Amino acid sequence: MVAKKRTKLRDKVSRLNAKESAVEEEVPYTSVLGEDPKAFLHQSKETKKEKQSLKHSSFLDRLREKSSANDFSGISKSAARRRKRKLRDDLKPKMQDLLTSLENDVEVESESGEEEYHDTVEDNHDPEIMEDAIPQRKVTRLVSSKKLKKHEKPSGSIVIKKNAPNIRNQRGAKQLSKQESERFNKVLTNQTFQQNPFGSLRDIIKMQKY
């Protein structure tokens, strides 16, 4: 029995050694790898820095294109609006330029009238014709806007003041209702209304309310 156990153990050890040697023979260890023939056939990849630099350059190119198309580049929006407003104001006709042009027209007309007067005086010596030939200067009168606003309004028109109460807000509606009630009481106490109600109502409606 003892001899059989020894032989069994020896057989197991020999089998294990044989397996280990077979594995070592199948997978030999190579310290130096051979050259890969496809090592230089891979595609070049862009790094993050290269991508960021490309994006930055394209963004700068777009900005340059916009700046070449627009004269207000590189300034804030409010400054651009101010410049555009100034350009619009410069395009509008100015009062001083209008006055100078009117004065030039008056001078040209007066010079032409004087030439005609001299021509008629040289041709005719009749005093009546000479009096008719005297040129009359055209004078431009400047009227203030206040006088234009004070023109007479037609009957039945309603004049609304700038500081009149507004019916849309609560305070204005309250004030308007108070004014209407006072006006209604005045109409009722009027003698003409008591004698002829419809005629007086018609006259009051035609009157100016404000």
Swiss-Prot record:
Pfam families in the record: SLX9
Location(s) in or outside the cell: Nucleus, Nucleolus
Broad class of the protein's primary localization: nucleus
Record-annotated disulphide pairs: none
Biased amino acid composition, Acidic residues: 104-117
CC annotations in GO: 90S preribosome; nucleolus; preribosome, small subunit precursor; small-subunit processome
Name this protein carries in UniProt: Ribosome biogenesis protein SLX9
Organism: Candida glabrata (strain ATCC 2001 / BCRC 20586 / JCM 3761 / NBRC 0622 / NRRL Y-65 / CBS 138)
UniProt gene name: SLX9
